[in-house]
A protein has these predicted regions:
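Conserved Rossmann-fold NAD(P)-dependent oxidoreductase catalytic core, especially the SDR/UDP-sugar
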Residues: 72-74, 84-128, 132-134, 138-144
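Mid/C-terminal beta-alpha module of Rossmann-like enzyme folds, strongest
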Residues: 190-252, 266-301
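N-terminal Rossmann NAD(P)H-binding glycine-rich loop of SDR-like oxidoreductase domains
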Residues: 3-23
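Conserved glycine-rich Rossmann-like NAD(P)H-binding loop of the short-chain dehydrogenase/reductase
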Residues: 25-32
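Flexible, glycine-rich beta-alpha linker
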Residues: 118, 139-156, 209
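Extended, low-polarity transmembrane helix blocks
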Residues: 253-324, 339-354, 360-421
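A conserved pocket-lining segment of Rossmann-fold NAD(P)-dependent short-chain dehydrogenase/reductase
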Residues: 159-178, 182, 186-190, 194-197, ...
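NAD(P)H-binding glycine-rich loop region in Rossmannoid oxidoreductase-like domains
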Residues: 36, 42-92, 96-98, 110-114
Length: 421
């Protein structure tokens, strides 16, 4: 079958792409950049649903496509952006499919149509309803929380999993998570056994789990025992999510808090009745993900960044305040006095402050880490040449820079690239 896979660079799209290609299907894959994994039998095209919503002629429908799979989704709290991409952009895509006689699988989300106060779900539901009213062969697949390597929610959960005490927004709401392998298998089941009429199918795991129960399953898969959980008091959670709304945080905002406090459940038998497929228990899928060493690295990374920020800002404050005279005495030891010494101490403090701030901005983080490496090496070289006695400090103040060098290098090498999908 010739399939148009939209959103092929996303978490779900990447897994679908590889499996459908391995099954022998001819694929036209899209991303905003028009680039992605180079696989035999896969052609890449550029498609931006924001532009398609404004101009349906933005995208030329590929010849011979029999099935459209829409795997796009936007992690956003901006209701206008969600309506543009997930509703109007999807509608324009469905119109193209209808005009060209293609069937459609719409990957929606469990809860769409039932929680209109959640912009993410409301925009999905609007597109779902439009598709079902077009009169084309269509299936709206509404999966629960999908887990597996590379997913945003999966990364957040794996980052939480190593800690023995875990604070959560809610500890009682239940969901039915499933593994990405089961979502892919469900799509394959639809291709083998297409429903007679356009329909909505919930896709859920067989077990209803609270977030602590889910995290304990992930911990067990990595060799840890159960953790202890602390529900964040509303007096702390509510102001925090309002701040998240203002700053555009994806992991902490009003939408996330509302979802975290609600059950999101469905009948696992509905999918089985339609396609004879049912998702496996999550525990049976936790083989290659999560991986203990990656979870620990992801968990400690923000802690290490925060510590480095505090160190750089701390040295800046000390040099400008209580340690200023000490800094001048050190400059005198290398023969620098007067205004030049004061400029050197103040300039060094300001440089430290700027580098600490650079760590907080993702777009500047790589540059800041490289500059930190250069600055620390320069400091150590100057000390080695002109102030070698500082190497013999009983507290190892200079020698400890070796640890900071390694930590900074690790952060630089593991800093994720920002790609345009």
């Amino acid at each position: 079958m010739r399939i148009l896979l939209v959103g092929a660079n996303g978490f779900i799209g990447r897994h679908l792409l590889r499996t459908l290609q391995a099954e022998g299907h001819s694929l036209v894959a899209t991303s905003r950049s028009g680039r992605g994994a180079e696989l035999p039998g896969v052609a890449w095209l550029s498609l931006d649903l924001t532009m398609l919503a404004a101009d349906p002629s933005h995208f030329q429908w590929p010849q011979g496509v029999e099935l459209l799979i829409n795997a796009t989704g936007v992690l956003s709290t901006d209701a206008r952006q969600l309506a543009t991409v997930q509703d109007r952009g999807a509608r324009a895509l469905f119109d193209l499919a209808a005009d060209n006689g293609a069937s459609v699988i719409q990957l929606s989300a469990l809860g769409a149509g039932e929680q209109p106060d959640i912009p993410f779900l409301a925009s999905k539901a609007a597109a779902d309803d439009y598709l079902l009213g077009l009169g084309v062969p269509a299936v709206v697949l509404r999966p629960s929380l999908v887990l597996g390597e590379g997913g945003a929610s999966s990364q957040w959960l794996s980052r939480l999993s190593p800690w023995p005490l875990i604070p959560l927004l809610d500890t009682w709401a239940r969901a039915q998570p499933l593994h990405i392998e089961d979502l892919v298998a469900a799509v394959l089941a639809l291709l083998r056994q297409w429903p007679a009429q356009p329909c909505v199918l919930p896709l859920v795991g067989p077990d209803a789990l609270t977030l602590p129960e889910l995290l304990d399953q992930l911990r067990a898969a990595q060799g840890w025992g159960p953790a202890r959980y602390l529900q964040i008091p509303a007096a702390i959670a509510n102001p925090a999510v309002r701040l998240g709304d203002r700053l555009g945080w994806r992991a902490l905002n009003t939408q996330v808090l509302t979802l975290a406090r609600r059950d999101n459940l469905a009948d696992a038998q509905a999918m089985k009745a339609a396609t004879d497929f049912m998702a496996a228990p999550l525990t049976s899928r936790l083989n290659e993900w999560p991986r203990r060493e990656l979870s620990v690295a992801a968990s400690l990374r923000p802690v290490l960044l925060a510590v480095l920020v505090l160190i750089w800002w701390g040295t800046a404050v000390v040099c400008l305040g209580p340690g200023h005279e000490w800094g001048l005495r050190i400059m005198a030891e290398v023969g620098v006095h007067g205004w030049l010494a004061r400029m050197a101490v103040v300039g060094g403090a300001l440089a430290d402050a700027v580098l600490g701030a650079g760590l907080l901005l993702r777009r500047w983080r790589r540059h800041a880490l490289r500059a930190q490496l250069a600055l620390m090496l320069a400091y150590m070289l100057i000390i080695s040449l002109w102030l070698p006695h500082y190497w013999f400090d009983p507290f190892g103040a200079v020698a400890k820079n070796a640890v900071l060098l390694v930590a900074t290098l690790w952060l630089l090498w593991t800093e994720p690239e920002v790609h345009r999908r």
